[in-house]
Amino acid sequence: MSKTTRRISTLFAAIALAGAASYSLAAEPIKIALAGPVTGPVAQYGDMQSIGALMAIEQINKAGGVNGSMLEAVTYDDACDPKQAVAVANKIVNDGIRFVVGHLCSGSSQPAADIYNEEGILMITAASTTPELTQKGHTLIFRTIGLDSMQGPTAGNYVVNQLKPKRAAVLHDKQQYGEGIATAVKAALDEANIPVALFEGVTAGDKDFSALIAKMKMEDVDFVYFGGYHPEMGMLLRQSAESNFDARFMGPEGVGNSDISAIAGEASEGMLVTLPKAFDADPKNAHLVEAFKEKKQDPRGAFVFPAYAAVQVMADAMTMSNSQDPEVIAETLRNNSFDTPTGVLEFDEKGDLKNFSFIVYEWHADGSKTALTE
């Protein structure tokens, strides 16, 4: 073989190796952990997050991915349990994943967020509404949903101005999310001088509320707010109807899903609930709604589109910054606006959305709902 031939062969080999290395780098997926309840009494919320996030990943990958890399979801089950959430967070750290969509329950998000921020992992929750989550000075924690401090006044204002109850009971499940939103609603009632006859907690998982219902009947309560999730609210509604306790019930987005109709049956008719806007009804999202339906998935869940938005803003920030460094992406999130299926999103320095609206809905026994506010 001549020197010239050898040089050409060597050159082609070098080019081939460089190309292979480049292809290997480009093909390396960007892993995103989906952390939330896969099992447990509120696993339905994990399903909402999952279908929203996975749809976003699918759509982004179809469009070419992020800077030449595909996105890949890795699911972790925290069962909405704070201790399990810590174990999940540590597993994500050990697995070398630097991006998280989750967690859902505020009590799980808080301890997990501490770990992620310490370990340099970017977290965007589509469901945790407790203000405390973003009040610790963390720089890598964001959310694509509003706060209890927004949702509480929305509920309170409706109750004060539209329902005008004579005596109220404000209940919660003794957990961070439920007690937090219940406290915000009580504050609105107190400010309006509406008597709150009872403010107390129930234990998550309880199924017998007969004593509590008897107490509310004795106190002539005509309005009940429950801060918590659908399993307890469903039982409260059903047992209240069975006890002929005729009060209007209301709860946050944690009670607003189809399972409550399965638990409470006809007793769920007329329940009031604060939820994000029905993003599935927005004409600009028609193509996504159709894509969900083709997969036989329900796009109506409160956290479906916020989870989609969480993945999208994460990917958009990677593209804008041409980086996979969580710190760089966090800074990009804080300094740009993002057009998503939930609207144009802008984040403040703490990682909260600058604007987000909750709407009061009337729930129907068939699982449908009617908007009462805009």
Q: Whereabouts are the PLM-identified features?
A:
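Gram-negative bacterial Sec-dependent N-terminal signal peptides
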Residues: 9, 18-19
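Sec/Tat signal peptide C-region and signal peptidase I cleavage site
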Residues: 20-26
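Extracytosolic ligand-binding ectodomains
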Residues: 2-12, 26-374
